[in-house]
Design a protein with these regions (language model features):
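Bacterial N-terminal signal peptides
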Residues: 7-18
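Acidic/histidine-rich helix-loop elements
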Residues: 52-67, 118, 181-198, 249-254, ...
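Flexible, acidic/histidine-containing loops and adjacent segments that form or flank the divalent-metal
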Residues: 24-27, 94-225, 289-360
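Conserved beta-strand hairpin/beta-sheet module of binuclear metal-dependent hydrolase folds
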Residues: 24-80, 202-226, 230
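Metallo-beta-lactamase
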Residues: 81-92, 245-249
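Divalent metal-coordination and catalytic microenvironments
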Residues: 32-33, 42, 53, 88, ...
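Proline-aspartate-enriched helix->loop->beta-strand connector
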Residues: 106, 265-271
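Active-site environment of divalent metal-dependent phosphoester hydrolases
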Residues: 36-38, 58-59, 89-95, 115-119, ...
Length: 360
């Protein structure tokens, strides 16, 4: 009898500990410090996980991209990546995948299809490209699939929580207009656009995703660059406005076209930058010029400058160059009507109301 009681107490404690890891029925998003790479982990109310990009290669040591993703996954209470989305084939976005697969199982991999030649079309670079991509090609996963525009990730719904959907707005420079988007009136901001030189790198092919949780909307587009950002929302905007904007391309000025940011009109932005990469003054100026944005959050302080390179320091997860790899977290209420962004390591947090009166 005593042994059974002890087992019961252990089970109750384990369940209580698991519940403390992630509040029931919240949608949680983690921006993990990839030291200038990208890695965004989404954990659904049903406990499924979606990882967008895996940072750089670096083995499985404590400070590697894979180890930091694994650490965040453990904090989120998950033991498997159900879906891995690789937005494009640059090393700082796919490089940590093979290392991560050595630490935890990976379910379905979705990407643009592994190129046979250099992803940026660089001539005489095929040998180097082949060596660099081989670990990604070889790592173990349950399945692999080429992402298509309009594709929906079949995430599980949860009783008592808002409806959840996650779909591909576009990829490989194709952005179809959904039938519910009105096409009788063009996007008014498009008239003010300025083109940049054509981007021939794989950045321009980045997968663009939109997450909806009830009224809450989150936009993430890898390293999508200037002209493609304009093409995405002009002449028609298939996305509408969003609550949360993952700043494109680490905050570089090759991206974050004002046409895109103004069309999305986010309430919050989160930037996955490095201490000397991204967070460019032009991007910060664009974000500050958008009236809807209440707070700009950053993974790193940009050491190249002061306020023109950075948001308010309290909203930066890692201030020193030699840092602890702190992440930024967003927890969305089960109703989808409010959400809290925080830096758990510093205790800074801020709660926002979701925009409710959108046409779509």
């Amino acid at each position: 009898m005593k042994k059974h009681l002890i087992k019961l107490l252990v089970l109750i404690l384990a369940l209580a500990t698991g519940a403390a890891v992630r509040a029931a029925s919240t949608l949680d998003i983690y921006w993990i410090d990839m030291e200038g790479g990208a890695g965004t982990l989404i954990v659904t109310p049903a406990g499924e996980s979606v990882l967008i990009d895996t940072g750089n290669p670096g083995g499985t040591n404590t400070d590697s991209s894979a180890a930091r993703i694994h650490k965040a996954a453990v904090a989120a209470g998950i033991s498997k990546i159900d879906y891995l989305i690789t937005t494009h084939f640059h090393m700082d976005h796919y490089g940590g995948a093979a290392d991560l697969a050595a630490l935890m199982p990976i379910g379905e991999v979705l990407d643009n299809g592994i190129p046979e030649h250099d992803s940026d079309g660089v001539t005489n670079n095929d040998a180097r490209w082949t060596r660099g991509i081989q670990p990604y090609r070889d790592f173990k996963a349950d399945s692999r699939k080429v992402m298509q525009p309009g594709e929906v990730i079949p995430l599980k719904q949860t009783s008592g929580a808002a409806p959840l959907s996650f779909y591909c707005v576009g990829t490989r420079q194709r952005y179809p207009i959904p039938s519910y988007v009105p096409t009788n009136v063009t996007n008014p901001v498009c008239a003010e656009g300025v083109e940049h030189p054509v981007d021939t790198t794989d950045n321009a092919n980045s997968i663009v995703m939109l997450l909806k949780f009830g009224p809450f909307k989150f936009f993430v587009a890898g390293d999508l660059t200037w002209n493609m950002e304009a093409k995405l929302v002009c002449p028609f905007n298939p996305i509408g406005t969003v609550d949360l904007y993952q700043v494109d391309h680490h905050g570089l000025n090759l991206s974050n076209n004002p046409l895109l940011v103004r069309s999305l009109s986010p309430t919050v932005s989160v930037m996955s930058n490095g201490s000397r990469k991204g967070a460019m003054p032009e991007t910060l100026a664009t974000l500050r010029s958008v009236p809807s944005i209440q707070t700009m959050w950053q993974i790193h302080r940009n050491t190249l400058g002061g306020t023109n390179f950075n948001t308010d320091y309290q909203y930066i997860a890692n201030l020193p160059v030699q840092c602890e790899g702190n992440y930024i977290k967003c927890s969305v209420d089960p109703s989808g009507k409010s959400y809290t962004v925080s830096i758990p390591a510093t205790g800074v947090s801020k709660t926002y109301a979701t925009v409710l009166d959108r046409p779509y």
